């Protein structure tokens, strides 16, 4: 349904995430991937949703002056929020192990902000999903890290992977948001806005 609406607009997805690219493909969108390296650093005073909003906008600002009139840029950022602490992508194996130990037997929030930028305007949408892990043994965490290497994922896990299948006991909200993009909200935004 969106293909016709965007036949004269070039959608640019600024994400190296294979999961986000697959979602865009499955939404039947014609898009191009363009990447720019930015340092994902945020002011320590920011909390929760403020962090992902800030980082999604920061990623979009890297394209200031580069967009043509008929181009729509999409950037996003996802993080795990647990007890007033942001868990982004792990620095290394030990950091990933520690994150999963913290998530064990706890409910956390997965927060994603998506920024839509054209030559003339920037808008942002976001989503929050609550996810509960049961008790994860150190042996299960080690097995997961050794075999799935989730070092490119916020919170050091993929809900669609082994650890999600054996460890997640409850989810309240958007499943696709936990994977990395709230597709339902993205689709409705694209459907209902003019670019």
Curated annotation (Swiss-Prot):
<feature type="site" description="Important for substrate specificity">
    <location>
        <position position="160"/>
    </location>
</feature>
<dbReference type="InterPro" id="IPR003697">
    <property type="entry name" value="Maf-like"/>
</dbReference>
<feature type="site" description="Important for substrate specificity">
    <location>
        <position position="19"/>
    </location>
</feature>
<keyword id="KW-0378">Hydrolase</keyword>
<dbReference type="GO" id="GO:0036218">
    <property type="term" value="F:dTTP diphosphatase activity"/>
</dbReference>
<protein>
    <recommendedName>
        <fullName>dTTP/UTP pyrophosphatase</fullName>
        <ecNumber>3.6.1.9</ecNumber>
    </recommendedName>
</protein>
<dbReference type="GO" id="GO:0036221">
    <property type="term" value="F:UTP diphosphatase activity"/>
</dbReference>
<dbReference type="Pfam" id="PF02545">
    <property type="entry name" value="Maf"/>
</dbReference>
<dbReference type="InterPro" id="IPR029001">
    <property type="entry name" value="ITPase-like_fam"/>
</dbReference>
<dbReference type="GO" id="GO:0009117">
    <property type="term" value="P:nucleotide metabolic process"/>
</dbReference>
<comment type="similarity">
    <text>Belongs to the Maf family. YhdE subfamily.</text>
</comment>
<comment type="function">
    <text>Nucleoside triphosphate pyrophosphatase that hydrolyzes dTTP and UTP. May have a dual role in cell division arrest and in preventing the incorporation of modified nucleotides into cellular nucleic acids.</text>
</comment>
<feature type="active site" description="Proton acceptor">
    <location>
        <position position="77"/>
    </location>
</feature>
<keyword id="KW-0546">Nucleotide metabolism</keyword>
<feature type="site" description="Important for substrate specificity">
    <location>
        <position position="78"/>
    </location>
</feature>
<dbReference type="GO" id="GO:0005737">
    <property type="term" value="C:cytoplasm"/>
</dbReference>
<keyword id="KW-0963">Cytoplasm</keyword>
């Amino acid at each position: 349904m969106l293909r016709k609406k965007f036949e004269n607009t070039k959608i640019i997805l600024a994400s190296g995430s294979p999961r986000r690219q697959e979602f865009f493909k499955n939404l039947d969108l014609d898009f191009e991937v363009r990447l720019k390296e930015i340092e994902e650093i945020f002011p320590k005073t920011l909390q929760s949703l403020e962090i992902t909003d800030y980082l999604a906008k920061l990623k979009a600002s890297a394209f200031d002056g580069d967009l043509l009139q008929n181009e729509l840029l999409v950037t996003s950022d996802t993080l795990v929020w647990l007890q007033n602490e942001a868990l982004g992508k792990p620095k290394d194996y030990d950091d990933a192990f520690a994150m999963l130990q913290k998530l064990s037997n706890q409910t956390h929030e997965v927060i994603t902000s998506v920024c839509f930028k054209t030559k003339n305007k920037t808008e942002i949408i976001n989503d929050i999903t609550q996810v509960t892990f049961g008790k994860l043994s150190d042996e299960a965490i080690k097995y997961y890290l050794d075999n799935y290497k989730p070092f490119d994922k916020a919170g050091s896990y993929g809900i669609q992977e082994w650890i999600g299948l054996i460890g997640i006991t409850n989810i309240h909200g958007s499943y696709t948001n936990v994977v990395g993009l709230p597709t339902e909200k993205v689709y409705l935004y694209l459907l209902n806005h003019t670019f």
